[in-house]
Amino acid sequence: MAAAKGTAIGIDLGTTYSCVGVFQHGKVEIIANDQGNRTTPSYVAFTDTERLIGDAAKNQVAMNPQNTVFDAKRLIGRKFNDPVVQSDMKLWPFQVINEGGKPKVMVSYKGEKKAFYPEEISSMVLTKMKETAEAFLGYTVTNAVITVPAYFNDSQRQATKDAGVIAGLNVLRIINEPTAAAIAYGLDKAGQGERHVLIFDLGGGTFDVSVLTIDDGIFEVKATAGDTHLGGEDFDNRLVSHFVEEFKRKHKKDISQNKRAVRRLRTACERAKRTLSSSTQANLEIDSLYEGIDFYTSITRARFEELCADLFRGTLEPVEKALRDAKMDKAKIHDIVLVGGSTRIPKVQRLLQDYFNGRDLNKSINPDEAVAYGAAVQAAILMGDKSEKVQDLLLLDVAPLSLGLETAGGVMTVLIKRNSTIPTKQTQIFTTYSDNQPGVLIQVYEGERAMTRDNNLLGRFDLTGIPPAPRGVPQIEVTFDIDANGILNVTAMDKSTGKANKITITNDKGRLSKEEIERMVLDAEKYKAEDEVQREKIAAKNALESYAFNMKSAVSDEGLQGKISESDKKKILSKCNEVLLWLEANQLAEKDEFDHKRKELEQVCNPIITKLYQGGCTGPSCGTGYTPGRAATGPTIEEVD
């Protein structure tokens, strides 16, 4: 595939589902994957023979829960001992281990134990999205804009960028999901004077509320709030707990420790939840859920709303907080935009509508696709797309948390306030605390609390070589500079000597080293090559099987009676049966073996078939009846739990 210089894609890398779009011919195309779905599960599965990504991974999760990884976004850029990681680990069927303070996912792949960083798992999902786009466009794509929740701190943003690099992408920019949704929305509503927009994004795993103003193509994020751990999965969990209790009541058995039963129940619950957005009742039918017991039951929308009542009501708190931070009254909001699949839930819409005194909600954009839509537009802008639709757009993002440094007594001195528009640069003069102090320790924090001990330390460095002087005399100029990706550079300079030191905040030790990233890039290519070998192997196997079946049906065709001698017919049938028996016994053979068997079979069949043709074949099996490599006549799909 040739690479096209001018195309960049937008990827919404979600906790549970991901989506990819491209801006071309003046409009955004959201691209369907090989299964025809416009969103792809953010799942990666490892088996004894292969690696699966997306739908294929999610579909086999009930059979292989320990080796099917999802929710990598909850791990990315976090430390192993982060309370979020520790509490999530209790809910995951896969194993998370601690390697040097960082979490890694441990799975069994091709019979060996393997540990992957969250960045690697996310990179596999990104690779899948990249390939989805390439299949649609017909050429290689490397440039991309990737979105993250507005809440992501610096190390989570860096780690997401690393995942893009491992996937072979040139990450043009990391942008906030609500900002991306606003772009999608702003494109549709250009030229209406200043508008205040509230974006309510309730996805599979995260919840974000953002307040922005859009004025003549300029977007400004005024405030963001939310809950990094609220979404569709939590509603699924409530349903699962409800049905586990119901199963206990009805059958006096506890299924909660049986991972496969719980996973099958969860799949049915997710389906029921979706059904309840359009119907008032949903039925669950799960055959042989546990110890041979069939579980047939139903749930009403009202009961579902009751089970999740506190979670649904809780979505309004971040709405109030975002409005407070933006210093905006709710009556001043022009548009309320719904993003994320969970905003389809009628109760959530009703609560939001009531809070805004019955105002209409904007549902014009497909909530699952809005973020990828905006990312695709932003990608086109960064690639210099000159079409009128995108030319007038300017994007102003914000810093999600206040940034500052520690001064005497452990006080947090803020240089960049939370919700400041980025990119931004702030400079302040500091001085020494004691006489003849030879150096200062610059400690950089993010957070909203008055004391640094309650905030998050991002990094520290020393500025040494300050000439002896009384306290308060030296002038140390400290500059905080955040670039468009939200990456922070802090510089300190002694004005008397011009001596300076700086740090790029890539969260302490939280980031992968250049070597690690390079190793992961190579690993990713290796896994991709292995996947390719596996695909070719399956294709060769299928081609052999279908050729054998086609030959069998061709020579047994009524229309060939009298055209083919019994001995020839027998010869073909016995060779076909021999090959099919060999196939059954050698499912895991190599591609060459399948190809070799097919040649063997062709050597027997071709002379006979050629003879038939020359004899002027007329039966219905003539022509296409025995084209080698036609699809196998056996079943090609399998039921999913």
UniProtKB/Swiss-Prot annotation:
<dbReference type="InterPro" id="IPR013126">
    <property type="entry name" value="Hsp_70_fam"/>
</dbReference>
<dbReference type="GO" id="GO:0002199">
    <property type="term" value="C:zona pellucida receptor complex"/>
</dbReference>
<feature type="binding site">
    <location>
        <begin position="204"/>
        <end position="206"/>
    </location>
    <ligand>
        <name>ATP</name>
    </ligand>
</feature>
<dbReference type="InterPro" id="IPR029047">
    <property type="entry name" value="HSP70_peptide-bd_sf"/>
</dbReference>
<feature type="binding site">
    <location>
        <position position="73"/>
    </location>
    <ligand>
        <name>ATP</name>
    </ligand>
</feature>
<dbReference type="InterPro" id="IPR029048">
    <property type="entry name" value="HSP70_C_sf"/>
</dbReference>
<protein>
    <recommendedName>
        <fullName>Heat shock 70 kDa protein 1-like</fullName>
    </recommendedName>
</protein>
<dbReference type="InterPro" id="IPR018181">
    <property type="entry name" value="Heat_shock_70_CS"/>
</dbReference>
<dbReference type="GO" id="GO:0044297">
    <property type="term" value="C:cell body"/>
</dbReference>
<dbReference type="GO" id="GO:0044183">
    <property type="term" value="F:protein folding chaperone"/>
</dbReference>
<dbReference type="GO" id="GO:0042026">
    <property type="term" value="P:protein refolding"/>
</dbReference>
<feature type="binding site">
    <location>
        <begin position="14"/>
        <end position="17"/>
    </location>
    <ligand>
        <name>ATP</name>
    </ligand>
</feature>
<dbReference type="GO" id="GO:0005829">
    <property type="term" value="C:cytosol"/>
</dbReference>
<feature type="region of interest" description="Substrate-binding domain (SBD)">
    <location>
        <begin position="396"/>
        <end position="511"/>
    </location>
</feature>
<comment type="similarity">
    <text>Belongs to the heat shock protein 70 family.</text>
</comment>
<dbReference type="GO" id="GO:0007339">
    <property type="term" value="P:binding of sperm to zona pellucida"/>
</dbReference>
<dbReference type="GO" id="GO:0005524">
    <property type="term" value="F:ATP binding"/>
</dbReference>
<feature type="region of interest" description="Nucleotide-binding domain (NBD)">
    <location>
        <begin position="3"/>
        <end position="388"/>
    </location>
</feature>
<dbReference type="GO" id="GO:0031625">
    <property type="term" value="F:ubiquitin protein ligase binding"/>
</dbReference>
<comment type="function">
    <text>Molecular chaperone implicated in a wide variety of cellular processes, including protection of the proteome from stress, folding and transport of newly synthesized polypeptides, activation of proteolysis of misfolded proteins and the formation and dissociation of protein complexes. Plays a pivotal role in the protein quality control system, ensuring the correct folding of proteins, the re-folding of misfolded proteins and controlling the targeting of proteins for subsequent degradation. This is achieved through cycles of ATP binding, ATP hydrolysis and ADP release, mediated by co-chaperones.</text>
</comment>
<feature type="binding site">
    <location>
        <begin position="341"/>
        <end position="344"/>
    </location>
    <ligand>
        <name>ATP</name>
    </ligand>
</feature>
<dbReference type="GO" id="GO:0005737">
    <property type="term" value="C:cytoplasm"/>
</dbReference>
<keyword id="KW-0067">ATP-binding</keyword>
<dbReference type="Pfam" id="PF00012">
    <property type="entry name" value="HSP70"/>
</dbReference>
<dbReference type="GO" id="GO:0005634">
    <property type="term" value="C:nucleus"/>
</dbReference>
<comment type="subunit">
    <text>Interacts with PRKN.</text>
</comment>
<feature type="binding site">
    <location>
        <begin position="270"/>
        <end position="277"/>
    </location>
    <ligand>
        <name>ATP</name>
    </ligand>
</feature>
<dbReference type="InterPro" id="IPR043129">
    <property type="entry name" value="ATPase_NBD"/>
</dbReference>
<dbReference type="GO" id="GO:1903955">
    <property type="term" value="P:positive regulation of protein targeting to mitochondrion"/>
</dbReference>
<keyword id="KW-0143">Chaperone</keyword>
<dbReference type="GO" id="GO:0031072">
    <property type="term" value="F:heat shock protein binding"/>
</dbReference>
<dbReference type="GO" id="GO:0005886">
    <property type="term" value="C:plasma membrane"/>
</dbReference>
<keyword id="KW-0346">Stress response</keyword>
<dbReference type="GO" id="GO:0008180">
    <property type="term" value="C:COP9 signalosome"/>
</dbReference>
<dbReference type="GO" id="GO:0140662">
    <property type="term" value="F:ATP-dependent protein folding chaperone"/>
</dbReference>
<dbReference type="GO" id="GO:0016887">
    <property type="term" value="F:ATP hydrolysis activity"/>
</dbReference>
<dbReference type="GO" id="GO:0051082">
    <property type="term" value="F:unfolded protein binding"/>
</dbReference>
<dbReference type="GO" id="GO:0051085">
    <property type="term" value="P:chaperone cofactor-dependent protein refolding"/>
</dbReference>
<keyword id="KW-0547">Nucleotide-binding</keyword>
